[in-house]
Amino acid sequence: MASMSVDPVTEPRMYQQTLLQDGLCDLLDANKFVDCILKIKDKEFPCHRLVLAATSPYFKAMFLSDLEESKKREIVLKDIEPGVMGMILRYIYTSDINLTEQNVQDIFMAANMYQIPSIFSVCVSYLQQKLVLSNCLAIFRLGLLLDCPRLAMEARDFICDRYLLIIRDQDFHQLGPSELAAIITCDSLNVEREESVFESLMDWVEYDTDERTKELPELLHCVRFRLMPTSYFKEKVEGHRLIRTNQELKKELQLIKDAQKGLLHRVKRSSHRKEGKSAEFESDDDDEDGLLPGILNDNPRFGMFQSDLILMINDAGTVAYDVGANECFVASSSTEIPKNHCSLVTKENQIFVVGGLRYNEENKDQPFSSYFLQFDPMSSEWLGMPSLPNPRCLFGLVEAENSIYVVGGKELKEGERALDSVMIYDRQSFKWGESDPLPYAVYGHGIVSHKGLVYVIGGKTESKKCLRRVCVYDPSKFEWKDLAPMKTARSLFGTAVHKNKIYVVTGVTDNGLTSTVEVYDIASNSWSEFVDFPQERSSLNLVELGGFLYAIGGFAMMPNETTEKLEPTEMNDIWKFDEEENCWNGILREIRYAAGATVLGVRLNTLRLTKI
């Protein structure tokens, strides 16, 4: 008989612990050796003193003391509900507890009050896993209240990562001064501009001006004014109504103005700042070992390492390219991106992918749909969203008025009928619905949004003829309107908004590929010719990034290496338009990550990314 490997330490110990706990539970169920009854309101809980003392320092101290309770069989407990104590005792005897969002806070506080570390730790782990935007501030405050650094720091890190979303929540205004300070002093705050920190602080103060103005002298030391533009500091900070009339605050801000002129003051080590009074200062030369006051802190925040990147998304992974540094980063190694997808970056820099074919056998009425994914820069993962009904390809994807539009395209089924339908995803209700259809069926078109309006450009009709047609949709009026047509009918081209104009680059015409470029002036509703792209292409990616236009990839007709016959060939290069020289300049001959990818111009924090 084959011998079984047994850890001589771990397995017997675990077996003994289980045996002991099961035995104690059996004794309790049989009401054997019960020597203690916990009475809470009208509910009684029989138990064993030895078990309580072994589990809780609170009960151990009670039973070993000379207090009256140490001799009583019946112990009355207050400040706890019977249901909560019942769950705690169940855990003590069985290691089983059913935590929910409704009961976890009561159990957590009871575990803290009665010093039961095992339940305390279980509650901490549960709350860490349940951190979301709607509860992170409450969990942070709870961690501070119960003196639990592990929970408070986890919640604070979550808040710092999503600070610009958190400050919109009404709970933000309920933070106490010390709680707010603990957040906005962090280097890990995910903000690109320090102005956001100052504005959120003043918003918090103005929620209860009478009570909170007195907290400003201390809280202003959490803001890094030296990271702000001088013009903003002068106009918005010094000019703020709560600051310009306060002499104490003006004295504090004088330190910033001195620092802007190159004079840094340091706090004397021997001095102690008292509430409501300024610290004593001396010049840098007088005290080399002095400390800079907090108000002069100029360390960049975590979010200030955001960079303009070209993001390439395909089924092999997601890679970001930094044009200025000529460096590539892995944004996500996920290979779950569907083929034939479209991608979108919103004005809030949120990244989405729609496309592919998804089969759900449980949905008998509509088993086929398309994938809908959102990129989470915190985890570097693509998160599943409600799938798109009515799967399609060669459609347009755009955002306007906080909704995502899927416009036109071709059906992903036999016949591949061109579509005029428009699907809309409401980011408030998290649901797909139908919007007003296009005036005509179209696929392979270009689509952009600008100032809340959706522009549909060119494409092909059911008859496979290229279009010059351009129309605009106004979500506030629920109507489509025709605009001036393009000069050249085309489909499968690159398009982007740049300096309030819409650029259309290369594409497919009824006669083949084209290298022509034209520009639509939104203000005058007119088209004009532009500098041709250096090569005829289709499916070129055009992005606006950091005030410049970049053209990436696409397909060109290139000679076969053996037959010299022209064949469609995928290009993986990057071009940039030079406005001073008025020409397209190649900046990278080949970037393999662009193969089969959709391309976006985004801003991501390179500290989160893995450099290739």
From Swiss-Prot:
InterPro entries on file: BACK (IPR011705), BTB-kelch_protein (IPR017096), BTB/POZ_dom (IPR000210), Kelch-typ_b-propeller (IPR015915), Kelch_1 (IPR006652), KLHL40_BTB/POZ_dom (IPR030607), SKP1/BTB/POZ_sf (IPR011333)
Kelch repeat residue numbers: 350-402, 403-452, 453-500, 502-547, 549-604
Tissue-by-tissue expression: Expressed in skeletal muscle and heart. Detected, although at much lower levels, in brain, eye and fin.
Subcellular location, record wording: Cytoplasm; Cytoplasm, Myofibril, Sarcomere, A band; Cytoplasm, Myofibril, Sarcomere, I band
PROSITE patterns: BTB
Pfam families in the record: BACK, BTB, Kelch_KLHDC2_KLHL20_DRC7
Mutant lacking the gene: phenotype: Morpholino knockdown of the protein results in a curved trunk and small head at 48 hpf. Morphants show disruption of skeletal muscle patterning with an irregular, wavy appearance of the striated myofibers and extensive gaps between the myofibers. Myofibers show disorganized and irregular patterns with small aggregates of alpha-actinin, suggesting nemaline bodies. Animals exhibit sporadic muscle tremor and coordinated swimming is not observed.
KW Cytoplasm (keyword) present: yes
Biological role: Substrate-specific adapter of a BCR (BTB-CUL3-RBX1) E3 ubiquitin ligase complex. Required for skeletal muscle development.
Protein name stated in the entry: Kelch-like protein 40a
Organism encoding this protein: Danio rerio (Zebrafish)
